[in-house]
């Protein structure tokens, strides 16, 4: 096992006041606790081997919270903090840990998370062409092909026209 990509993502539309509180524990269970379990196991294994790459998929709203996804964004803030904590804990063992924070990607994520015209808006007309999943995969591949002594701790990948968040 050379690479682990932690891509836990359970979205939830709305902020603290408007999101469905019955879903809060599930969001944190998947995005934070579930991801942390995988990070622990991967970190333990890779520190024993003294090599490896761990890539965590966060979100731009984990750095710049949107009022339309404040609760989800808070879970991505949390996994970002855990990722950086793990990086500091295991970097001396030759294990690289990186956080990738995508902007808006064309996928089923928004529908499943409950976003609609009111809380998501017309992203294409506002931001232009949105990201395809391949753009994120290309960013991850770039991280992984850097020399072993180089670790890009964080990378934010947005559509060129996405000025918020």
Describe the function of each predicted region.
Residues 19, 65-74, 85:
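Active-site loop-to-helix junction immediately N-terminal to the catalytic Tyr of the SDR YXXXK motif
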Residues 39, 75:
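Active-site helix of classical SDR
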Residues 59:
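Residue(s) in the substrate-gating loop at a strand-loop-helix junction
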Residues 95, 99-103, 119-165:
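C-terminal helical subdomain
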């Amino acid at each position: 096992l050379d690479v682990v990509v932690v891509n836990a993502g359970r979205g939830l539309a709305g902020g603290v006041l408007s999101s469905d509180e019955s879903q809060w524990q599930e969001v944190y269970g998947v995005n934070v606790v579930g991801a942390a379990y995988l990070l622990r196991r991967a970190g333990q294994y890779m520190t024993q081997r003294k090599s490896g790459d761990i890539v965590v998929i966060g979100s731009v709203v984990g750095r710049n919270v949107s009022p339309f996804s404040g609760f989800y964004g808070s879970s991505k803030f949390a996994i970002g903090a855990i990722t950086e904590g793990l990086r500091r804990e295991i970097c001396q063992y030759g294990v690289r840990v990186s956080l990738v924070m995508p902007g808006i990607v064309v996928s089923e994520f928004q529908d499943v998370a409950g976003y609609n015209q009111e809380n998501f808006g017309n992203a294409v007309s506002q931001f232009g062409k949105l990201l395809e999943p391949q753009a994120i995969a290309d960013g991850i591949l770039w991280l992984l092909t850097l020399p072993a002594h180089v670790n890009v701790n964080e990378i934010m990948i947005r559509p060129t026209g996405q000025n918020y968040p």
